[in-house]
Amino acid sequence: MIIREFLENNDSGIDFEDTDIDIKEKEKKNMIVSNAIEKMIDFYQGSQHDINHFLKVWSYARNIGQMEGLDDHTQEVLELTAVVHDISCPLCREKYGNANGKKQELESPPLVSEFFKDLPVAEEDVKRISWLVAHHHTYTGVDGIDYQILLEADYLVNAGESSYSRENVQHMLETVFQTESGIRLLKSIYLR
């Protein structure tokens, strides 16, 4: 508060009214992601593996998105997608006996739509999130930075949880990873 008063009294040129609006918008968007996280934790009904997995993917996605300088809207869509990216795993385990990636992609769209129906997320964004979740095990046809970062964040977590070989990690580095931040993380974690 002291710094703000100093700047206001010394004609800093900063429009604090606009700054306050920007801060409130960011806080509102952060609450949407936080509410989605809480809802997803409840959705997984105590499955610590599923909960910890999505939280790790969300954390990597959030970090990579920020490091790559995503605009606020793309960052929010990315984070919400990371939260729900494995939403169909419980259904797939029950229906097919496993959570195969292609089956996850097939089963996820209606679950994503239902999940977001009572959260303040634009219909256009829900469609994008649903599409991304329905492709998060497909490494071709990447059509945006949100998709690219989701693939990288999920792989960073899966590589550790499933003890992928050094050769597998090296292959992904050469064929899938594109962002500078994702590449740095992959090398730092798995290729030392």
Residue ranges of each PLM-predicted region?
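Divalent metal-dependent phosphate-bond-processing catalytic cores, especially two-metal-ion Mg2+/Mn2+ enzymes
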Residues: I2-L7, D11, I23, E27, ...
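Compositionally biased, low-complexity intrinsically disordered regions
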Residues: N9, F16-D18
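Active-site flanking loop/helix segments enriched in acidic
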Residues: V33-K56, S88-A99
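An active-site-proximal "capping" alpha-helix that borders the catalytic cofactor pocket
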Residues: V57-Y60, K102-D118
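Short helix-capping and hinge/turn segments at secondary-structure transitions, especially at repeat
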Residues: Q66, S88-Y96, S113-K117, V121, ...
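His-Asp-centered metal-binding catalytic motifs of divalent-metal-dependent phosphohydrolases/nucleases
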Residues: Q75-G97, S108, S130-H137, D154
